[in-house]
Amino acid sequence: MACHCFPVFPNDDEPQSPESECISCDAELDFQLDETCELPGELTVAIGEGPDDFLPLADGEQPEFYAGFQGGGHSFFSVQVGNVELSRYDRLEVVVDAYYPEECPDDGTHCGPSYGRRVVVLDGEPWTLVDGVVQEHGILMQLEGQTVAQVTVRDPCGRVGWAQHRW
């Protein structure tokens, strides 16, 4: 899998970034819908934090903030996806977005349009399988102030799941 890595260098005033050569990784892989695939149910999606693991976030909880060397800031998100059929397919399409609260209605509906990055991921690193649920950690996002993070996941069978986290 090909990766584009984005190192983060914290300053001494903020928590230190975990030691890692590659903190975020975008896969350069094709994603195609399989018109013959029909699976019941939806994908379940949860947003957490963590550069090395999935750590759930409580409602309204802000993820840990790491200061960048040029004065910006970053947080590490993690994603958990359930109801995945790894026996049927080996990749997912994941879109990670961040919005200002005024750009996203507070009524539980999907925000849009998408400004995030499209990530197509195979199973295996950086994804892990934990108790039947697929997890990815170390998704680097540049955030400042109040934010709505949104993750939308689609499998090759066309099933979609999404989650939002506000703070």
Language model features with spans:
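Signals and flexible motifs at protein termini associated with secretion
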Residues: 1-167
